[in-house]
A protein has these predicted regions:
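A short loop-to-beta-strand structural motif that recurs across blades of beta-propeller domains
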Residues: 41-44, 80, 131-134
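Blade-loop segments of beta-propeller domains
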Residues: 47-81, 92-105
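Residue-level detector of Asp-centered blade-edge/turn motifs that repeat once per structural unit
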Residues: 21-25, 67-70, 111-114
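Surface loop/turn motifs at the tips and blade-to-blade linkers of beta-strand repeat domains
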Residues: 8-14, 55-60, 95-101, 144-150
Length: 150
């Protein structure tokens, strides 16, 4: 069996990552989580049925996204969890993570089968095991479920 890999979009991402397929809308979401070292982090959306591509630049480092039932997103940004409305571009804070480490930020994350959004922290210099694994529950409470992560 052989596969053919095809480039769908030449969007110039520095670090395109975290793809999420929204089965309800037929849309592919992903992040260009470059951080402020290269340019503004951004959220991207591709509608394969039309070829339409949208992106939103952020003033925060972005680590992960999850799709909500209403077509909006939940984001794991550098300092906490946020709602994001693609129609307005508005960010709404859900909760900050209680992390005293100045070099840490939320990085990668995914939703489990119970609908809980997990996001792990990372040390920007990848040296110290001081980060946590955080869980955002459907009641919007957050819990630190593990620590000692680099």
């Amino acid at each position: 069996m052989s596969y053919r890999i095809e480039n769908l979009l030449n969007c110039g991402n520095h670090l395109g990552e975290g793809p999420v397929w929204d089965v309800d809308t037929g849309v592919l979401w992903w992040l260009d989580g470059t951080g402020r070292r290269v340019g503004n982090p951004s959220i991207w959306r591709l509608m394969p049925s039309t070829g339409c591509v949208d992106n939103w630049s952020l003033d925060h480092d972005v680590g992960a996204l999850a799709v909500r039932e209403n077509g909006k997103l939940v984001l794991a940004l550098d300092d906490g969890f946020y709602f994001f409305d693609p129609d307005s571009g508005e960010l709404e804070l859900i909760s900050l993570v209680d992390d005293d480490q100045p070099r840490t930020r939320l990085n990668d994350g995914k939703v489990d089968r119970r609908g809980r959004f997990f996001a792990g922290g990372m040390d920007d210099k990848e040296e110290l095991a001081v980060c946590g694994l955080w869980r955002l529950d459907s009641d919007l409470s957050i819990t630190k479920v593990d620590d000692g992560i680099i």
